[in-house]
Amino acid sequence: MCDDEETTALVCDNGSGLVKAGFAGDDAPRAVFPSIVGRPRHQGVMVGMGQKDSYVGDEAQSKRGILTLKYPIEHGIITNWDDMEKIWHHTFYNELRVAPEEHPTLLTEAPLNPKANREKMTQIMFETFNVPAMYVAIQAVLSLYASGRTTGIVLDSGDGVTHNVPIYEGYALPHAIQRLDLAGRDLTDYLMKILTERGYSFVTTAEREIVRDIKEKLCYVALDFENEMATAASSSSLEKSYELPDGQVITIGNERFRCPETLFQPSFIGMESAGIHETTYNSIMKCDIDIRKDLYANNVLSGGTTMYPGIADRMQKEITALAPSTMKIKIIAPPERKYSVWIGGSILASLSTFQQMWISKQEYDEAGPSIVHRKCF
């Protein structure tokens, strides 16, 4: 494959909350936009405005007042293919401004993605977008590659779902993967709830975006939750103020760390699940005893919901408490982990050794969609 812009591979990481897309070899995605498709609630109110039948991403977000918004990816898994096709179309033609039939395309998938889903992705890429070649890679595996490793356990937490994925020599170990349906969106909802208890009202989708911003700017993970609660109760040292778009200033105190504490104590939002430190430990314990040492020493954090200050230290403390006392435990929290899945895809798709791994149009025509199970694992 020649190295000119014409045949550069595309990398598209489809998350529940955000689509990250760009060109292989780049160090960051060119396009990052919300994974939403909006359709007008009422037909043609604006005469002659050339109203479209659907809007994608930021445009859907800004026009949400007149639209019904749908997320085609729920908990990391694509559930609405018509809308997903619109998102891919928007990614290629409006965001990256490329003709997909000229570029090999690397897509990402959630761990334990159903077989039928991988086939459907493959089929749409070849039949609707006519890509010359494609590949489907597991998100957590790409994050591990981005950190320069091929063995380790990834905690990948985004907007819709959290996974613990142990990986040995580049292969995810499916029997030990843990999935937790608690992620960024749930934390935003919980912050809305506890701010409402404080007397601030956040209810609409527009207000939810404000709360998400508060969460991203002010929340952090406490090393010792009880201690932090005591500190917050006895002094105002942990309080921060935030200016709302209308100029009103609100003060936020223990909510700053009560919100992400939910990751360690899902009972805060009424879930019976174990926290992320326990799911990590459980995942390691489901692996062969001989590789556990390598997993403990290579705990890689990935995804937007692992961006809270203090989360790595807290994980270190919690896992040390669960693991055998002599075990060396290391948490790796790369600064760019918000995009590490995409970055791993960019690295993989530009490796010379990877070029034989692509599923070509010819192979697809000969074998059909099931080729994906033979070539991508």
UniProtKB/Swiss-Prot annotation:
List residues, modification Methionine (R)-sulfoxide: M46, M49
Q: In which tissues is it expressed?
A: Shows overlapping but distinct expression patterns with other actins. In tailbud embryos, expressed in embryonic muscle (myotomes). In adults, expressed only in heart muscle.
A Gene Ontology molecular function term for this protein is:
hydrolase activity
User: Which residues are reported to carry the modification N-acetylaspartate?
Assistant: D3
Under the subunit heading, UniProt states: Polymerization of globular actin (G-actin) leads to a structural filament (F-actin) in the form of a two-stranded helix. Each actin can bind to 4 others.
Q: Tell me the InterPro entries matching this sequence.
A: Actin, Actin/actin-like_CS, Actin_CS, ATPase_NBD
**Residue list for modification N6-methyllysine:** K86
Pfam families per the record?
Actin
Question: What pairs make up the disulfide bonds?
Answer: none
Query: What residues bear Tele-methylhistidine in this entry?
Result: H75
- SUPFAM superfamilies from the UniProt entry: Actin-like ATPase domain
Q: How is it modified after translation?
A: Oxidation of Met-46 and Met-49 by MICALs (MICAL1, MICAL2 or MICAL3) to form methionine sulfoxide promotes actin filament depolymerization. MICAL1 and MICAL2 produce the (R)-S-oxide form. The (R)-S-oxide form is reverted by MSRB1 and MSRB2, which promotes actin repolymerization. Monomethylation at Lys-86 (K86me1) regulates actin-myosin interaction and actomyosin-dependent processes. Demethylation by ALKBH4 is required for maintaining actomyosin dynamics supporting normal cleavage furrow ingression during cytokinesis and cell migration.
Which domain of life does the UniProt lineage start with? Eukaryota
Instruction: List the GO biological process terms.
Output: actin filament organization; actin-myosin filament sliding; heart contraction; mesenchyme migration; positive regulation of gene expression
- Which cell locations does it reside in? Cytoplasm, Cytoskeleton
**Function recorded in the entry:** Actins are highly conserved proteins that are involved in various types of cell motility.
The name under which this protein is listed is Actin, alpha cardiac muscle 1
Q: E.C. number, please?
A: 3.6.4.-
What organism does this protein naturally occur in?
Xenopus laevis
